[in-house]
């Protein structure tokens, strides 16, 4: 590797990782409430320790969620079905401490209620709904993969997803739910990926498994198929370092081995460290929370900019004040990769094409639906196994037209 080249890494985790277990429980509860009342206001956190879960937060909804049942259903779907794997969904403890959302917060978010909202015009609704909190959010896109995601995090997610697939299908026996992946890619001085350097997989397994057997099976059934799918002939991967369970056995996993908490994998959830992060987590939050909806909207904006060929990569920063509809600021950073246009022209086109008020985002991306559980593992962006509305590139022509009209 030359001095101008650099190594960039990103990690992912499987759905059985204790933090991801908590994310999925929080989003399963959110989905259940949105399915009954699309205007539900939800902010639900989950924490996990050995044999016990605490679900807490604030909810205002016409719906009702049986939290105990939802926790156990989620755990069963992940694969925590017996004490042998470290957790039994049917016998673990579940403590619920959910209260109603603060009226002071609600008054800034929902100024129109009932008949007022029904009678209001779209513009009146968009102006009436302020941001659910202050904060800064980021969205990112790059043309180094077909999904317009950074290669390290995209590859790490694909490995984690396929690791779970072969566990659930039985293609590789003796695997248990907890697991992590990590990928290191070499980039050249033009910031292009040129070589796979390292693949790391740590996976929970049954006691009778040897590490040598596991390394062979994972290479055959997980690593090789994913590398062929994602890298193909585009990025050399014939001389990389493979690490499987580098500390040795990994029998005890999940919440039995480590405490879990909603919102503790925010870099895994987004861009693997390739972009900035405002710090706000996603899971358990309804779309009135701009931590979530604005992060989705900025990904949508960034992806359309790159898909339109205006820049090779772009990061969008947006900021809000609680109770105020219009963003405090919107910044476009193209890292010097803009193509035939200036950064200022792109920023002006974004302001013309995208309405980034919270209610407008919710309407445009149709976010008042039970779509969030599927986001809670393997990344919120750049997915190929499920379609999310913020991944659409429906504003490409409008952006080009806005640029041409300047």
UniProtKB/Swiss-Prot annotation:
L-methionine binds at residues 58, 101, 258, 289. Pathway: Amino-acid biosynthesis; S-adenosyl-L-methionine biosynthesis; S-adenosyl-L-methionine from L-methionine: step 1/1. It holds the Pfam family S-AdoMet_synt_N. It is an enzyme of class 2 (transferase). Transmembrane segments: none annotated. GO terms for biological process: one-carbon metabolic process; S-adenosylmethionine biosynthetic process. HAMAP family: S_AdoMet_synth1. This is S-adenosylmethionine synthase. It comes from Bifidobacterium longum (strain NCC 2705). The gene is metK.
